[in-house]
Every structure is written in structure tokens, then in C-alpha cells.
Amino acid sequence: MNLEHIVELRVRYDECDPMGFAHHANYMKYFEIARTDLYRARGGSYRDFEASGLFVVVANIQCRYHMPARYDDLLKIAVKIDRITEAKIEQSYIVLREDTKIASGEATLAVVDRDGKLQRIPDILRDPLEGP
């Protein structure tokens, strides 16, 4: 599987620490923005998915920081679906400023019901992520 999606965003002032660097916690938010935009771009709707009583949760996430991003930098966040199994979705991320790698990471996602019980990944989530 090699489905990839890219989102552009600008580092906002409120995301920066006193040194003017994007605070490290924001990268998880950047990953989530790319992840949800990928699903939307493929015709999916998290709102509709959650209305069915199922939720996508992050089971594991990692981020490696290569270079600092600064206030007003224009970043590209690429998310790639690496693998989908019956119970999890594995994704990888790269954050770029022009051609400079700023950060990279991986996440493992799972689906749970309202009680937090692990569920198989349903077609409503799988189909947009596996389609052509």
C-alpha cells in the first residue's frame, strides 16, 4: 500500500515557544491534521464514522525531530498509509519546509466502540483508505 496525502500549513505564533520554534507537542496535531484530511480527501467523513458509534484512536505514535520549524514557516505534512490489517492502520509522516526534513514519525491507529472495546476496522473506514 502506498497511498500518500500532503497538507500544507503555516506555523502560527501561538504554536511557538519563547525561542520562536514550533513547540514539540504541535507535531502530533500536525500529524492529526494530515491524517483526517487524507480521509476527507478520499471521500470519508469522521463525523459520519463516529455517528455510527465507532472511533479511531491512536494506539502508538512516535515523532523524531530533525530541525526546528519556526513561526510563519510553510510546512508540508505528508501522511502515508503503510499497512492496514483487520485491527489496525499503520501510517508514517514526514514534515518538510521546502526540501528540508523537519520531523518524521509513525502512528498505529485502532478502532474502538463507545465502551473502548477494540473493533475490527469496518469497510466505511477501510474502503476510502484502500481504494485507487
Residue ranges of each PLM-predicted region?
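Generic structural detector for well-ordered beta-strands
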Residues: 8-12, 64, 108
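Short glycine/proline-centered loop/turn elements that form peptide/ligand docking sites
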Residues: 43-45, 57-66, 80-87
